[in-house]
Amino acid sequence: MMKLYIVFGFIAFSAAYVVPEGYYEPEYYPADGYESERVARASPAELIFDEDLADEPEVEEPQYYIRTRRSLQPGAPNFPMPGSQLPTSITSNIEKQGPNTAATINAQHKTDRYDVGATWSKVIRGPGRSKPNWSIGGTYRW
């Protein structure tokens, strides 16, 4: 209970403490940017009505940049789509297998001379959680 009174006393003291008026007043600089001519102890309201500030240069327009986003939607760039003519295809799948949730990633590269495939799978949630399984295989046609 005594700790509560001490904490309450600190809060009351900090709320009642008076800060001197000029203690937190920042120094303002003229609008032309010269730091050597400081306007000492001027309030923002006084600076607004200053005649020197009326001739401020115009503010430049912000520059906008457009970033093309990658997307998995059909027709998006940089991703092989199902049924496309690219020799490489990558598919992923997350599915529920009883009480377990399994993730699978398949990658295949097919040409007229060889086929290469890789598979990675892991049970990510459930009682059958384990280390990932992976396999890599390939065939070469003579």
Curated annotation (Swiss-Prot):
Signal sequence range: 1-16
Positions annotated as propeptide: 17-70
Annotated Polar residues bias: 85-96
Keyword Cytoplasm: no
GO cellular component: a single term: extracellular region
Tissue expression from the record: Strongly expressed in the fat body and the Malpighian tubules, and weakly expressed in hemocytes and midgut.
The organism's place on the tree of life at top rank: Eukaryota
Region (Disordered): 72-96
Disulfide links within the chain: none
InterPro entries tied to this protein: Coleoptericin
Stretches of the chain forming a coiled coil according to its record: none
Pfam families documented for this protein: Coleoptericin
Keywords: Antibiotic, Antimicrobial, Cleavage on pair of basic residues, Immunity, Innate immunity, Secreted, Signal
Listed GO biological process terms: defense response to bacterium; innate immune response
Subcellular compartments: Secreted
Function: Has strong antibacterial activity against E.coli, Streptococcus pyogenes, Staphylococcus aureus but not against Pseudomonas aeruginosa.
Protein family according to the UniProt entry: Belongs to the coleoptericin family.
Protein name: Rhinocerosin
